[in-house]
Amino acid sequence: MNNNELYVSLDIGTSNTKVIVGEMTDDSLNIIGVGNVPSEGLKKGSIVDIDETVHSIRKAFDQAERMVGFPLRKAIVGVNGNYINIQDTNGVVAVSSENKEIQVEDVRRVMEAAQVVSVPHEQLIVDVIPKQFIVDGRDEITDPKKMLGVRLEVEGTLITGSKTILHNLLRCVERAGIEITDICLQPLAAGSAALSKDEKNLGVALIDIGGGSTTIAVFQNGHLTSTRVIPLGGENITKDISIGLRTSTEEAERVKKQLGHAYYDEASEDEIFEVTVIGTNQKQTFTQQEAANIIEARVEEILEIVSEELRSMGITDLPGGFVLTGGQAAMPGVMSLAQDVLQNNVRVASPNYIGVRDPQYMTGVGLIQFACRNARIQGRKIGFKMPEEAIQEIAVSSSEEQEQHHHQNEVQQRPKGKQKTQAEHNKQSKMKKLLSMFWE
């Protein structure tokens, strides 16, 4: 079995906390484990209870660990767009080696030089994202390692965030027993996975409609230029349904997930469902169209605020259109309504990997892909190998399965003789069970 590098991403959202385990083979990502649990301790994207957030993180990791069959102790952590600032930066260093071949250490030094800027006391540097490297005046270089030169420059994007919010996030992750290998801005990571090169060059807005908030990320000329966070999301839709149908939040959430439709004109009059009237045992019947009337109003409001925010940023033309992602983007009718409200090209982006083909996983997948690419350029190690005991256990399980299969073939070929017991026929290896759980 190949022992490739493994990477784990942690996406802490208002509604759900998600862990994704990926295996990188060259530039190809293979998802081997997922944890997804309801979040506790967050409101509108911000941590309001440390202990509850730690508990949610631990539960998500436990779920992912059961799928992969070994402990997970490291993760790439996503930071949402709340209280984030973006600015241009640059750094310059002299190439240090005698033969003037640019080494990993030179790339590290120039990235550190780009961080030597004055930031407000209440802000911390989250990351520097290189736009291009310049070697002796030659620009548009994506990876300068092994090139010859005397002077190495980098032009990049400096990302800073609220010191308090970042400290709270990192404290929660560390208290959950997880070592942080990298920190990435979520809109940037999601954009790296959801958007095409052409879209980012032309100008595109990535709209991540989450549970507690909606994040706008604008990409122009190939790079992230600005982000905004709107404190409205799926939880507001659930609350509206609860009020409109006079039912509990739990029932409203069920209606939203199972029968929700965001576009009244496309919703069904024939699709009928029942909910319990809150405070009574009485049932009341509604159609999908009646629920859509409630949902459409809130989603339309969110999209109109998105338009207003873009205008306030001075963005009036986006030839690349809009790309929707996040958990609420999967709801039927959202794309049709967005096309009406935004008056532009709109599509919904989902990861194209087995087990995570849903817009809610776009950020988690993007965190792995984005962090891997940046770490490779800067010569940083953020992955880890599968534990030796786990490899041996899988190898033993695989060997036992092959032996069992061979023995079954022998038994089938015998005209007479003692047959295998039912228990032996039902025996499954650990990996087989793991795979069957994953494919469900």
Swiss-Prot record:
Parts of the chain that traverse the membrane: none
First-listed, main subcellular location of the protein, grouped into a coarse class: membrane
Protein's UniProt keywords contain Protease: no
PANTHER family: CELL DIVISION PROTEIN FTSA, CELL DIVISION PROTEIN FTSA-RELATED
InterPro entries: ATPase_NBD (IPR043129), Cell_div_FtsA (IPR020823), FtsA/MreB (IPR050696), SHS2_FtsA (IPR003494)
Coiled coil: none
Pfam families with a match to the protein in the record: FtsA, SHS2_FTSA
Topology versus the membrane: Peripheral membrane protein
Task of the protein: Cell division protein that is required for the assembly of the Z ring. May serve as a membrane anchor for the Z ring. Binds and hydrolyzes ATP. Also involved in sporulation.
This protein's name: Cell division protein FtsA
Location relative to the cell: Cell membrane
Record organism: Bacillus subtilis (strain 168)
Family: Belongs to the FtsA/MreB family.
Quaternary structure and interacting proteins, as annotated: Homodimer. Interacts with FtsZ.
GO molecular function: ATP hydrolysis activity
BP terms from Gene Ontology: cell division; FtsZ-dependent cytokinesis; sporulation resulting in formation of a cellular spore
Keywords: Cell cycle, Cell division, Cell membrane, Membrane, Sporulation
UniProt keyword Membrane present: yes
Other remarks in the entry: In B.subtilis, unlike the situation in E.coli, the role of FtsA in the recruitment of other division proteins to the division site appears to be an indirect one, through ensuring that FtsZ forms a proper ring.
GO terms for cellular component: cell division site; cytoplasmic side of plasma membrane
Induction, per UniProt: Transcription is controlled by three promoters. Two of these promoters, P1 and P3 are expressed mainly during vegetative growth. The third one, P2, is up-regulated around the onset of sporulation.
